[in-house]
Amino acid sequence: MKIFNWVHKRLHQRVVKDGFAGNVKKSELETNDKDTQAFLKQVGLVNVDGLDGWRDGILTIGTFGFDPLKPSTHQNEYFVLESEEDDQESHGFSHSGNDDDDDDDEHYDHSVEDEELNPLMFTTFEHSFEDIGSNFDAIVQKPADVILTVDGVPLTPFEGSSEISTKPDQSANDQSKNKKGQRITLADLFQADVPDVGQLKLDSGKVQPEMEKKMNARTRSGLAFAKKLIPRVKDDSSPIKNMQRLMRRMLKRKIHPAELEVKIHKSDGQKQPSAVELISNVENDAYESVSLLPIQGAPCVH
């Protein structure tokens, strides 16, 4: 695991401070050289010429030096120097300051620790926090006769509070009705959506006569609209079918007028006359009209 620890140290190079720059750099270089030599001796590649150029940059693939068998102190070796420097700085500040300042700092640290809750501790000791809160509420209770005021004006309790509500809740009544076996129908739901719900009375899920009158008025108005479109429709039970028939006829006349004419003539048993026949008929009619005129010297036929 030395190679992994070495790579981990190289990855986490800390920022060196002013007073300890030279000593820390020397110690790091010495430890890195020792680790590389130990690794190369263990592998047996010390005398290989190919490794001379990249001994300091050996590529490693692994868990980056986290060994579960080792204690946590060995895993966090690269934090030792930082912790020592922080301790020295804190001691230096404490010697330079007064005793009162030390007391204030300690008090401030304790207050900050009290304010910030560790999430792990909160999850593990959540039941104890709840017990403390319940005991505190039991000790500090609001007396029954206290009246809350704002600038001398008493506050009225909100609707639905325990102080105002003396009658049983409507939800409790609904639950009791459901338990008795009464069903809620669609009529009840529709009546609940009506704006004047206060005027209507719910009678065991039955439709009220006022609602029936409103529905009848709506259906009559719909039939009146159909009568305006189709004047022949009076009290016919199927205005939609008649409308569909009318639309079919209109479409046939607009799209295929020739076919309709042919069908009409076939139904009458007559053929459509051609242009020549029409002209000949006109000439014959003219001759007949001329022959009927009186002629001088011709005998009159009685």
UniProtKB/Swiss-Prot annotation:
UniProt-listed GO biological process terms: morphogenesis of a branching structure; phyllotactic patterning
Compositionally biased intervals (Polar residues): 162-175
Composition skew (Acidic residues), residue ranges: 99-115
Keywords: Growth regulation
Region span, Disordered: 82-115, 159-180
KO phenotype (gene knockout): Pillar tree (erect shoot growth) phenotype.
Motif IGT motif in this chain: 57-63
InterPro entries associated with the record: TAC1
Tissue specificity note: Highly expressed in flower buds. Expressed in branch attachment sites, vegetative buds and young fruits.
Family: Belongs to the TAC family.
Functional description taken from the UniProt entry: Involved in the regulation of axillary shoot growth angle. Promotes horizontal shoot growth.
Annotated protein name in UniProt: Protein TILLER ANGLE CONTROL 1
Natural source organism: Prunus persica (Peach)
